[in-house]
Design a protein with these regions (language model features):
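Outer-membrane beta-barrel "beta-signal"
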Residues: 691-694, 725-739
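Outer-membrane beta-barrel initiation region
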Residues: 241-412, 490-498, 509, 596, ...
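Interaction-mediating elements
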Residues: 3, 23-298, 305-307, 317, ...
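C-terminal motif of bacterial Sec signal peptides marking the signal peptidase cleavage site
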Residues: 18-21
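Transmembrane beta-strand segments of outer-membrane beta-barrel domains in Gram-negative
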Residues: 203, 331, 382-577
Length: 739
């Protein structure tokens, strides 16, 4: 029955596509055509014709998922009477049929030829043809590139000896850059060389140099597919009436700091100097100017920066004025919140104090106090039915490396911050009382030119103290023979975690790699025996009468974004994480264990509903504690498409699971085994909607189970072939994209 319903829905959808496709020709004027499709191809084998598609001026109507012209179909459902709101609405959210324009086609043909010539195909041609069917038309552009031109020789004609010396000094350092004999002759390559020389000279004091002073002469008369290239650097001329001279090389005489707000700049002189990449007595540098802007932009105490230069008459000296506008140094905020945990209602308040210039170095002090109260229902055998939580956190963010062992030049070249934090969390529940004390010291820095950012947790301490556990909770969950669970018990004991971690992120817009590694308890594990630490009944070493955790954890994730056109793209994602407890720990702390399912994982399952392995929870229900693991695998493919207005759509396939590295009796079927794990990979599919407001995205995903490793029967294991909405459906709401 369920399969018949799906077939029926698919049939209705196909009928809708056919009807709207036919009705769209109603909007095509007589003797004109609907642009049904645009094709671009080449008569030269192996030539990437699709890469030149952006040069085509008139495109056919957009398609959802690169298949269905739903926007045009929606528009076609409207009537011509725009006084009716239904017609106006359909036309607004839809897309008007594209009427073929001969002029646009001829201009596109010309643009394609120019693009081919710029790519080195100097004798390229582009032919154009059309195919008509009824009121529809297919436009076909055929590229005839011919043979590309190559550079036979490169010569530089530089009449300014000072510039000649600068370029000569740079040549050994950048031997792989610039124009070279044997390389393709393209406009892009010439532009790159023009930009390279201009940047080099602007960074070497030639304040008034610009790329128009560089011209190229190409001689191809003696070669059929080769050119002899001359790069000319013209001398300086201020204007058409001014004499021709050598290019002036400017030096910075003084740097002066002023306040936009007519108030004193409340930053230490050393901070101003540290963030100013420009240096008195050195040649002007455009790169150092940009770096100075970036340095001051990252300071929380500064609102914006304006840098101006003044020439001293009849000299090559510059005076630099750095004008700073300062932020309000202190802010206080009060934020009430409403909470809803599994139907239990509550309230919370958050008080925040922030000082953006604590030590006159743009250090940010943040103090947060949070209190929460929740009335818990459905608990039996407990005296108290309320949940209370209080949290206090103090954090100082320094906009630089706090590391005296690092060289001054290393610290200046990187955008970095150092963070020190302390926090205390108090939780009183009917079942137990928990206290958590945390402290951390970490660095963050980035290399924007290489698309890299780093995080180093030099030390991260967490002390968990359980001052009280109710007798009812002990009897029912911790001490009961039938419910004796090592994973559960471990998470209701006093525990000390001492972490060192490192993470790196690479993101160039198309490829993203995130890698993290952390080790916990290794320093303590190394000194426990030599220093004579005592052991508890479980054989674990104790510090201050508390056992410490010991494990290593590593994660890596890779995402690839493939754009087919401005409206359609494919996102591919792979994630792998492994955590191994050893030494002083046999079980990972609950907060460090992996879980699967949810909005950012395998979306056919709710959060913490999947795994580990073929484990399916107690009595088939979600088992909050046991459905966690030491290893996680995620594989995702998501096709993203533009729908209309701010609404985007997605179709996805997810696969993955979690596993344990040890065989825990509470998690039968959960251990990772090389000959079994691939049979336990869960698969889901679904559709999603995204509301893209630019600064944030609201995401709604609807997933269905396709392969469920928790079951062995064909009907439940291969849910794709036997779909059951009640059993297999999962809905997710989240902010931001999943990867």
């Amino acid at each position: 029955m369920q399969l018949l319903k799906q077939i029926r829905l698919a049939t209705y959808f196909v009928i809708f596509i056919l009807i709207t496709s036919c009705s769209s020709t109603r909007f095509v004027p007589q003797n004109e055509y609907l642009l049904e499709e645009v094709q671009i191809k080449s008569d030269q084998k192996g030539f990437d014709a699709a890469s030149l598609e952006p040069y085509i001026r008139q495109k056919a109507n957009s398609k959802w998922f690169s298949l269905f012209k739903i926007p045009m179909g929606t528009y076609a459902l409207s009537g011509r009477d725009t006084t009716k709101w239904v017609n106006r609405t359909l036309q607004k959210i839809g897309e008007k049929p594209v009427i073929f324009d001969t002029l646009q086609a001829r201009l596109s043909q010309k643009d394609l030829k120019t693009a081919l010539q710029n790519a080195g195909y100097m004798h390229a041609e582009v032919s154009f043809d059309v195919k008509t069917k009824g009121k529809s038309l297919t436009a076909i552009y055929t590229l005839h590139p011919g043979k590309p031109y190559y550079i036979n020789s490169v010569a530089y004609d530089i009449q300014d000896q000072q510039i000649q010396r600068v370029l000569a000094l740079d040549r050994p350092q950048n031997a792989t850059l610039g124009l070279k004999a044997g390389s393709r002759f393209t406009v892009d390559r010439l532009d790159e060389e023009r930009e390279r020389i201009t940047k080099l000279l602007l960074d070497s004091g030639f304040y008034k140099f610009h790329k128009d002073f560089i011209v190229f002469e190409a001689d191809s008369t003696r070669q059929r597919t080769g050119v002899n290239l001359i790069v000319k650097l013209l001398k300086y001329r201020a204007n058409s009436d001014a004499p021709i001279t050598n290019h002036p090389r400017y030096t910075i005489r003084t740097i002066r700091y002023t306040s936009k707000d007519s108030t004193k700049i409340n930053l230490r002189p050393s901070v101003l100097m540290y963030n100013t990449a420009l240096i008195e007595g050195e040649p002007f540098s455009a790169s150092k100017l940009q770096q100075t802007y970036l340095n001051f932009a990252k300071l929380q105490a500064i609102q914006y920066t304006n840098i101006r230069f003044r020439e001293l008459p009849d000299t090559t000296l510059l005076d630099c004025d750095i004008q700073l506008s300062q932020q309000k140094p202190r802010t206080i905020s009060f934020q009430p919140e409403g909470t809803n945990t599994a139907g239990d209602l509550g309230a919370a308040v958050l008080f925040t104090y922030e000082n953006r210039n604590l030590f006159r170095g743009s250090e940010v002090l943040s103090l947060q106090l949070r209190g929460a109260f929740e009335a818990i229902t459905g608990l039996e055998g407990y005296n108290d039915q309320d949940y209370q939580e209080y949290n206090a956190e103090a954090k100082i963010l320094f906009p630089r490396f706090l590391a005296p062992f690092l060289s001054h030049s290393f610290r200046r070249q990187r955008s970095a911050s150092s963070e020190i934090s302390l926090s205390y969390n108090l939780q009183n529940r009917p079942e137990f009382h928990r206290r958590v004390f945390s402290s951390a010291f970490r660095y963050r820095w980035s290399e924007p030119h290489h698309h890299l950012s780093y995080r180093l947790d030099l030390i991260d301490l967490n002390y968990v103290h359980m001052p009280w556990i109710s007798d009812t909770f002990k009897r029912d969950y911790l001490d009961s023979v039938s419910n004796r669970n090592a994973i559960l018990r471990y998470n209701y004991e006093n525990l000390l975690l001492m972490k060192i971690g490192f993470g790196v992120t690479y993101n160039d817009g198309q490829h993203a790699v995130i890698a993290n590694i952390e080790t916990v308890g290794n320093i303590l594990g190394g000194v426990a025996k030599p220093l004579g630490f005592k052991k508890n009944e479980e054989g674990q070493y104790k510090l201050f009468n508390t056992a410490f955790a010991q494990f290593v954890k590593g994660d890596i994730a890779y995402t690839r974004l493939i754009a087919f056109d401005p409206n359609n793209s494919l996102a591919l994602h792979f994630g792998l994480g492994i955590a191994y407890p050893y030494g002083n720990s046999k079980v990972l702390p609950f907060e460090k264990r992996y879980f699967s399912g949810g909005a950012n994982s395998v979306r056919g399952w709710s959060v913490r509903e999947l795994g580990p392995g073929s484990f399916r929870g107690t009595d088939g229900r979600i088992d909050f504690i046991n459905q966690t693991g030491d290893m996680k695998l995620d594989m995702n493919a998501e096709f993203r498409t533009k729908l209309f207005w701010k609404l985007n759509g997605a179709a996805f396939i997810d696969a993955g699971n979690i596993w344990t590295l040890r065989d825990y009796k509470e998690q039968p079927g959960g251990q990772f085994k090389l000959d079994q794990f691939y049979k336990q990979i869960a698969v889901a599919y679904g559709l999603g909607l995204r509301l893209n407001f630019g600064y944030f995205i609201l995401r709604f995903d609807m997933g269905m189970k396709a392969i469920n490793p928790a079951y062995t029967s064909n009907e439940e294991h291969y849910a794709l072939l036997h779909p059951n909405l009640k059993r297999d459906f999962a809905f997710h709401f989240a902010v931001g994209l999943p990867f």
